[in-house]
Regions:
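C-terminal interaction segment
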Residues: 2-10, 15-24, 45, 61-74, ...
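Acidic-basic catalytic patches of nuclease active cores, encompassing PD-(D/E)XK
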Residues: 29-57, 64-72
Length: 220
């Protein structure tokens, strides 16, 4: 005779919670925050017309279903083949098992080499194709590209073009300059606003000039 378990005896699968926050701040200071937002928002502009490129900043990435301890929150990550839109976290098994292909980390004075080495191992293990790490205080950029099962160091990043992003890195004595595919450089939020204001002012002047010539700008 088959003995059935009572309701109280049946094993109920535990529902695992995947927190949206690890309790850590997005950045430790204004310089680090500036670089995180500049890279993230400029990449959003580069891929604005591609609905299947998801870009996020400081979003928890869970690569393994069933284990909420295996996680990382890259300063910026890019996932090709995934739609744009809201996420509380990036649970890879809900994303066609696509790992972010490109990751950026911006160093702060508080970062330790051991901490960054652990991040590199994590990204190598869980499928990142390109990993870039920038230290804005010492103007140092290092990068790694996937070779088989590992992330191998890129010998020189001055002039390097990201295979995935098609952006170019340039190191000057004062800073890192990142160029979009069209050659224009990444701008801060303030610089983007100034550029927009300048363009609007030039449009106003042009419209006034056309009216002086008897041309209605709205008909053009």
């Amino acid at each position: 005779m088959v003995q059935q378990l009572s309701t109280s005896e049946k094993t109920v699968p535990l529902e695992i919670d995947y927190p949206d926050s690890d309790g850590q701040p997005m950045s430790d200071n204004t310089e680090q925050f500036k670089w995180i937002t500049t890279i993230k928002e400029n990449l959003e502009l580069v891929f604005a017309d591609n609905p299947d490129v998801f870009i996020a900043g400081d979003l928890l990435w869970y690569p393994v279903e069933g284990n909420n301890k295996i996680r990382q929150a890259p300063d910026t990550m890019v996932a090709f083949g995934r739609p744009k839109g809201y996420r509380g976290s990036y649970m890879q098994w809900k994303e066609d098992n696509i790992a972010p292909q490109v990751v950026f980390e911006i160093l702060s004075p508080g970062n330790r080499r051991t901490e960054m080495a652990k991040k590199l191992l994590f990204y190598a293990k869980y499928g990142v194709e390109e990993y870039y790490e920038y230290d804005p205080y010492n103007i140092e950029l290092i990068g790694f590209q996937r070779q088989g099962n590992d992330l191998e160091a890129i010998e020189s990043l001055d002039g390097w073009v990201s295979p995935r992003l098609n952006i170019r890195f340039e190191l000057t004595p004062d800073t890192l300059v990142i160029h979009r595919p069209d050659g224009s450089r990444f701008l801060t939020y303030v610089e983007l606003g100034q550029q927009l204001n300048q363009a609007q002012a030039e449009n106003v002047k042009l419209a006034a000039k056309l009216r002086e010539l008897g041309i209605d700008p709205s008909t053009l």
